[in-house]
Amino acid sequence: MEAASRRQAILDRLRTADRPVSASALAAGLNVSRQIIVGDIALLRAGGAEISATPRGYVLPRATDGITRTIACRHTLAQTGQELDILVDNGCTVLDVIVEHPVYGQLTGQLQISSRYDVEQFLARIRDSDAAPLSMLTGGLHLHTLCCPN
């Protein structure tokens, strides 16, 4: 498969996916290395494709029938799961987390969390990586972009 057709196949797969697609899954489906996919994604982005990287893989923005809003939140690390569960239990998808850093300015982490399973996976990644959520940089103060049904 030539590079141009492979990149088109990547875009097609991302357009039809209902979940983030990992570079490894794309590589296996296209019979190339993960590194080739990462390079293709970079070239697609440079060409204007709005591909976002989440902790679970790549996504394209979707047109939604719902409402997209940004909310401000403040909580402790221990309350992170409770916050996310409340949001997804009410039908919201948590698209990202945003903090205002005094040196770097606005930092955004892509989340794409829409179910309790996604919440569990996110919390497990935090525990397993021994990394702190972005909100801990600002004493728990952060923003979330939500997509909610009408």
Task: Kindly give the residue locations of the regions a language model identified.
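Extreme N-terminal segment that seeds HTH/winged-HTH DNA-binding domains in transcriptional regulators
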Residues: 1-29
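Key DNA-contact positions within bacterial/archaeal DNA-binding proteins
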Residues: 35
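Mid-protein regulatory/catalytic core that forms ligand/cofactor-binding pockets
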Residues: 66-150
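Short, hydrophobic-biased segments on the C-terminal half of alpha helices
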Residues: 41-42
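Minor-groove-contacting beta-hairpin "wing" of winged helix-turn-helix DNA-binding domains
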Residues: 51-62
